[in-house]
């Protein structure tokens, strides 16, 4: 009984709410085998054919490429694209792609050479000996993405599943009307599809593998059963035909009874789903060593003379495929990429086939019917009854139309699979899916802007924090630099502390004198002498500093000389105004005269050693010479008027006369060496010379008188 219940449970299927049963229209194209299409002359390969960022270009204009050669590098979620045939890269520029608004995206344009040469292919027939990481990396680098319509990178999806996948589901439902690409692929390539499923199972190691297929594909079901006859690891589940049973969440619930939570993924409940075409592409990438360069595309519609399924190279213009199938356009002809419910109308026919292109529908006017005018919503709730995601389409419609993004998000607009069932049953002909697509795009743009604002705020706060840290570090460095003395100050402080400690030690150490011995004061005397020597050295250093400052400043020297002359003049006046009874001592006068002469000589030397740029003024020199001669004359008069008993020493007089003559001669030389532009007056020089000769003659006469 338990075995019977287990078998019943194993084959049980569930049914989801909502859904519709539109005309299938599949017999137009599923009756003929897959066929090849002649190569186009030019291929346009968009760099972004998947969910995620585009890869990095690795070719340049003018490069020769082979079929399967990478055109971009894939890192992370960036999926590479490959050359669909051999030829020459003629341009790398924006081009319209498979998008409702025909947005231009960066594309590589290749002119085919007609040879269709492959790159060297290295297949892994022994893939079971390869590690999981190696297989995932090969699948990713060979450009395999979800071919069921989403275009999510397969390698990233397998990597994200990890070890938590318990059920691997292969989606073979293909529920949308007109599309028969997967049906025909399973009829013609069932063995290769099953081999690709086994590769996926080897990577994921799930507990069960389920193939879900609708009962409107009897030939494909027969082929799969024939291939799976001897295997028990893969279960084929035939489900009732109902749109949209091919949705990921809907098929997961049909086969397992598990519901994917709102905002979650199927991997959250241990389920991973892949499309039939993706499994076939995995087999070719791993075992055959062929990157994805082509896929099966359904060409159908009453405007096509030879409908069917073809192997279309990626990058082939849509116009080329339709012309090969006998396209007979009518007035206002419409071409839809995808199915009638989830597809979109192409703005023009030069867009290329990409990885997510599964159908090209060219309906006639009879198939489309008359266009219906959009009317107001009557709140009939037919859309809510048909919604397979258990949403409220009429409420989402009002929120989308009123730009109420928060309420639309609260009502789980992100869970809308855009199946078009609500628009199919709407009696008011409201294109609900278009409103929902626009609303989701606006919400995504708002979130992207909020993300950028948050990142900018984080960068600003990080910058402010960094500036505060740097400021605090600078203040700390300044504080530590102020607290710690310089190296010289440290040495001086250490020396002073050492001296203080030495003095304290000497003061505290008792002096012991033995009986009969004299105290030894040599240490004290030596210390005293050292202090005296230190004081003398310091005084000499200060004197040298003052002398250097005095010599360096000629103006200061001149001021000091003027002060000395004023002092001498004042002294002479005091001597002249002295009481007559107090006669001037000739010796004292001679000493003062000698001191005055020494001061004058010292000042002259300082002036001569001054900076060369400040030359001696000849007029000042002449004035000083005249003053010196006047002082000498005055001293001689004082000596002559001295007491007769105290006669002047003739030798001193001769010496003084010689000194006076030398000073006069020196002053004449200074005047001669003065600036050439300021010439000495010859009359003044003659007068000075005459005065000097008179002084010398007078001194000689005085000498003779004294001898007599």
Curated annotation (Swiss-Prot):
Region described as Disordered: 599-686
Compartments it resides in: Cell inner membrane
Bilayer topology term: Peripheral membrane protein
Keyword set, alphabetical order: 4Fe-4S, Cell inner membrane, Cell membrane, Electron transport, Iron, Iron-sulfur, Membrane, Metal-binding, Repeat, Translocase, Transport
Family matches, as InterPro entries: 4Fe4S_Fe-S-bd (IPR017896), 4Fe4S_Fe_S_CS (IPR017900), Ion_transpt_RnfC/RsxC (IPR010208), Nuo51_FMN-bd (IPR011538), Nuo51_FMN-bd_sf (IPR037225), RnfC_N (IPR026902), Soluble_ligand-bd (IPR019554)
The EC number(s) this enzyme carries: 7.-.-.-
Annotated ranges, domain 4Fe-4S ferredoxin-type: 369-397, 407-436
Cofactor(s) this protein requires: [4Fe-4S] cluster
Record-linked Pfam families: Complex1_51K (PF01512), Fer4_7 (PF12838), RnfC_N (PF13375), SLBB (PF10531)
Cofactor binding description: Binds 2 [4Fe-4S] clusters per subunit.
GO MF terms held by the record: 4 iron, 4 sulfur cluster binding; electron transfer activity; metal ion binding
Enzyme class, broadest EC rank: translocase
GO term, biological process aspect, one: electron transport chain
Binding site residues for [4Fe-4S] cluster 1: 377, 380, 383, 426
Highest taxon, organism lineage: Bacteria
Binding-site positions, [4Fe-4S] cluster 2: 387, 416, 419, 422
Record-level GO cellular component terms: plasma membrane
Subunit comment: The complex is composed of six subunits: RsxA, RsxB, RsxC, RsxD, RsxE and RsxG.
Function (record text): Part of a membrane-bound complex that couples electron transfer with translocation of ions across the membrane. Required to maintain the reduced state of SoxR.
HAMAP family, per database record: RsxC_RnfC (MF_00461)
Record family assignment: Belongs to the 4Fe4S bacterial-type ferredoxin family. RnfC subfamily.
Protein name as it appears in the record: Ion-translocating oxidoreductase complex subunit C
Species annotation: Escherichia coli (strain 55989 / EAEC)
Gene for this chain: rsxC
């Amino acid at each position: 009984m338990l075995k019977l219940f287990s078998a019943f449970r194993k084959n049980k299927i569930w049914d989801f709410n909502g859904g519709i049963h539109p005309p299938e229209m599949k017999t137009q194209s599923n009756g003929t085998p897959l066929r090849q299409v002649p190569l186009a002359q030019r291929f346009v390969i968009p760099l972004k054919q998947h969910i995620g960022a585009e890869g990095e270009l690795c070719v340049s204009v003018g490069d020769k490429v082979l079929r399967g050669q990478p055109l971009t590098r894939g890192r992370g979620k960036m999926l590479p694209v490959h050359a669909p045939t051999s030829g020459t890269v003629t341009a790398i520029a924006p081009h319209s792609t498979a998008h409702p608004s025909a947005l231009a995206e960066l594309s590589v344009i290749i002119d085919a050479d007609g040879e269709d040469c492959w790159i060297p292919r290295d297949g892994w027939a022994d893939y079971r000996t390869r590690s999981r990481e190696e297989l995932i990396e090969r699948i990713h680098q060979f450009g395999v993405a979800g071919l069921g319509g989403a275009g999510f990178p397969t390698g990233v999806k397998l990597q994200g599943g990890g070890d938590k996948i318990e059920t691997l589901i292969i989606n073979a439902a293909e529920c949308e009307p007109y599309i028969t690409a997967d049906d025909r692929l399973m009829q013609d390539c069932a063995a290769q599809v099953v081999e690709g499923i086994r590769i996926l199972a080897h990577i994921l190691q799930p507990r069960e593998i389920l193939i879900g297929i609708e009962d409107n594909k009897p030939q494909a079901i027969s082929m799969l059963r024939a291939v799976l006859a001897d295997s028990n690891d893969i279960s084929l589940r035939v489900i009732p035909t109902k749109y949209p049973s091919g949705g990921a969440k809907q098929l997961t619930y049909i086969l397992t009874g598990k519901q994917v939570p709102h905002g979650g993924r199927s991997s959250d409940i241990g389920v991973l789903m892949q499309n039939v075409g993706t499994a076939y592409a995995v087999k070719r990438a791993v075992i055959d060593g062929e990157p994805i360069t082509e896929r099966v595309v359904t060409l159908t519609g009453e405007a096509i003379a030879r409908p069917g399924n073809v192997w279309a190279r990626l990058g082939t213009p849509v116009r080329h495929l339709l012309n090969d199938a006998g396209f007979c356009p009518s007035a206002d002809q419409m071409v839809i990429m995808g199915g009638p419910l989830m597809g979109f109308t192409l703005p023009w026919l030069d867009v290329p086939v990409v990885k997510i292109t599964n159908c090209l529908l060219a309906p006639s006017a009879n198939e489309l019917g008359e266009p219906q005018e959009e009317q107001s919503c009557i709140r009939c709730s037919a859309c809510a009854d048909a919604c397979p995601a258990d949403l409220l389409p009429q409420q989402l419609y009002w929120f989308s139309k009123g730009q109420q993004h928060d309420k639309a998000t609260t009502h789980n607009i992100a869970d809308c699979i855009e199946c078009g069932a609500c628009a199919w049953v709407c009696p008011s002909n409201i294109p609900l899916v278009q409103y929902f697509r626009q609303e989701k795009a606006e919400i995504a743009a708002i979130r992207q802007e909020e993300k950028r604002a948050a990142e900018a705020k984080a960068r600003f706060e990080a910058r402010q924090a960094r500036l505060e840290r740097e400021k605090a570090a600078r203040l700390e460095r300044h504080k530590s630099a102020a607290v710690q003395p310089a190296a010289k100050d440290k040495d001086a402080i250490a020396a002073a502390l050492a001296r203080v400690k030495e003095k304290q030690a000497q003061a505290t150490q008792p002096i012991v004198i033995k009986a009969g011995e004299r105290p030894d004061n040599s240490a004290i005397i030596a210390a005293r002498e050292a202090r005296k020597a230190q004081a003398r050295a310091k005084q000499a250093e200060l004197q040298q500093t003052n002398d250097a400052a005095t010599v360096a400043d000629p103006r200061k020297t001149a001021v000091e000389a003027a002060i000395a002359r004023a002092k001498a003049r004042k002294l002479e006046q005091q001597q002249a105004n002295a009481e007559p009874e107090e006669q001037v001592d000739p010796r004292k006068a001679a000493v003062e005269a000698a001191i005055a002469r020494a001061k004058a000589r010292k000042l002259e030397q300082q002036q001569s050693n001054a900076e060369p740029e400040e030359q001696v003024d000849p007029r000042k020199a002449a004035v000083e010479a005249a003053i010196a001669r006047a002082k000498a004359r005055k001293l001689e008069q004082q000596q002559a008027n001295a007491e007769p008993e105290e006669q002047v020493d003739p030798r001193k007089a001769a010496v003084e006369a010689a000194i006076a003559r030398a000073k006069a001669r020196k002053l004449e030389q200074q005047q001669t060496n003065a600036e050439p532009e300021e010439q000495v007056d010859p009359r003044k020089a003659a007068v000075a010379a005459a005065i000097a000769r008179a002084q010398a003659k007078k001194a000689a006469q005085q000498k003779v008188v004294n001898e007599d």
